Amino acid sequence: RDNTKKVPGHDAEYKKGLNRTNYSIFLEHTYEDRNITASAGVAAVKNTGNSDGFKFYPGVNASWRFLGNWKLYAAYNSSLRMPTFTELYYSVGGHAADKNLKAEKMQSVEGGLRFSRPWVNAVVTLFYNHGSDMIDWTKDLSEGADAPWRSRNYTKINTFGQEVSARIDFVSMLVRDDFFIRNIELSYSHINQDKKLEENIQSRYALEYLRHKFVVKADFHIWNGLCANASWRWQDRVGNYELFENKVSTCNMVSYKPYSLLDARLSWTSGY
C-alpha cells in the first residue's frame, strides 16, 4: 500500500505503475538544386521499455521537377512504435492484454508523379509498407460469445496501395469569381494486404482497412453570398463484425458491405 498513488479528483488510488523513457538522436542532410531536392537522415532510438540497445532507422527523400509543371518524387522511411500501456496492461471489460508485446517496426517505400498549375493539381502515388510485429486487438469467436479481445503481435504484414487524385479550380481557370462551379476534386485509393483474416477471428485495427475509396467533392457559388459544397464517397472495407440478435452474440462473423455517403452544406457570407 505504501506504493499507491492518489487519483486526482477521485476517491481512488493507483496500485500499479510503470515508467519508460525514450531517447532519440536525429541526423539529416538536405541538398537543393534548381530542380532537384534530396534529403537523407537517420534516427537512433532507444526506449527503456525495450531490452534492445539503440536501433537505427534511416530515411531518404528525393524529388525532381521537370518541364515546369511536373514533379517526380520517391521516399523510403523506417520507424518504430512502442506498444501503449493500454495494449500492454488493459485487461478489464472483456479485454486481455499481453504485457510481453514487442514493438512495431515499419518500412515504407513511396513514389509518385505530380502535375500542378494554378488551376489544376493532379497526383498519382504508389506505396508499399512492410510491417513486422504489428499490434492488434483480436477476438476468437471459436472460444464462444464471451471470448475476450486479446492484444497480439502479427509477424509480418505487407501492404500495397495506389492513390490517384485531381483538383480543378474553375475560378482560376476561367478567371471568373461568379462561375457556378468553383472547384471539383476527384480521388481514388486502393489498398491490398497479403495477411488475410483467419476464420472466426475478428480484427479491430491491423487487418481492417479500406480496400477501395472513391471521393467526389465540389464547391458551388449559387447567388451573391450563398454557397454550397457537396462530398460523395464510396467505400469498400475489408473486415468483419460480430453478428448480434436480440443483443446476444450469434458467434458468427459477417463481412462488411460497401456503402456510400453524401454530405452537403449551405453557407452564407455577408457583404459579398
Locations of the language-model features?
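Gram-negative outer-membrane beta-barrel transporters
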Residues: 31-38, 126-130, 150-243
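Residue-level detector of the transmembrane beta-barrel scaffold of outer-membrane proteins
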Residues: 1, 26, 37-41, 59, ...
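Extracellular loop and loop/strand-boundary signature of outer-membrane beta-barrel proteins
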Residues: 8-16, 43-48, 93-99, 108, ...
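Outer-membrane beta-barrel signature, preferentially recognizing the C-terminal barrel domain
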Residues: 51, 65, 71, 78-132, ...
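Transmembrane beta-strands of outer-membrane beta-barrel pores
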Residues: 2-4, 33-35, 42-48, 76-82, ...
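Hydrophobic, lipid-facing positions within transmembrane beta-strands of outer-membrane proteins
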Residues: 21-27, 42-44, 56-60, 97, ...
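Surface-exposed extracellular loop regions of Gram-negative outer-membrane beta-barrel proteins
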Residues: 16-49, 55-59, 177-179, 185-188
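Residues on the lipid-exposed face of transmembrane beta-strands in outer-membrane beta-barrel proteins
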Residues: 25-31, 60-64, 111-117, 126, ...
